[in-house]
Every structure is written in C-alpha cells, then in structure tokens.
C-alpha cells in the first residue's frame, strides 16, 4: 500500500476516529489493517524488518532498529500501532 492508501483505508474503516491513529511512517507495505477499540493501525513485524533490510541494513541491524525504535512508537499512547508476527 501507499501512504495515501493506508490513510484512505483507516478513514473508510474508522471514520473520524482515523485521525487519532498513529501510523508507522515508512512501513506502508507492512500495514495489515486496523483495530476498532481503541482505533489502532496493525503492522506485520516481519514485513517491517524486511522494509529495513531493503534500506540496506543487515537482518541483525534491522531487528535491532525495529525493536529499539519502530516498535516503541508512542508505546504509551492508546492509539499507538500494533505490531504482530505474521507467517511468511
């Protein structure tokens, strides 16, 4: 998905509550969907790590970057992204 498609999906599914959702910028291809209560974007951990390796990081570096920076995006915020393991 493109960033615009992610936003469009969230607006279509969540309506006004889409404005509250925190998205993980740069990980649009890892976007899977949304939760309703509370409204949150859902991403694949594996696809996020793949996106980082596609930027030139080794798998180890990508995993460190993901768990150290990406997965902690606004982690104390009710509308922070959800990251789940997916089968690949």
Give each language-model segment a name.
Residues 1-88:
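C-terminal alpha-helical interaction appendages
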């Amino acid at each position: 998905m493109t960033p615009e498609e992610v936003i469009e999906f969230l607006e279509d599914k969540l309506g006004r509550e889409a404005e509250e959702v925190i998205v993980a910028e740069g990980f649009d291809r890892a976007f899977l969907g949304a939760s309703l209560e509370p409204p949150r974007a859902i991403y694949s951990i594996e696809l996020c790590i793949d996106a980082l390796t596609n930027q030139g990081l080794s798998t180890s570096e990508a995993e460190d970057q993901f768990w150290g920076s990406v997965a902690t995006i606004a982690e104390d915020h009710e509308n922070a992204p959800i990251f789940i393991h997916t089968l690949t």
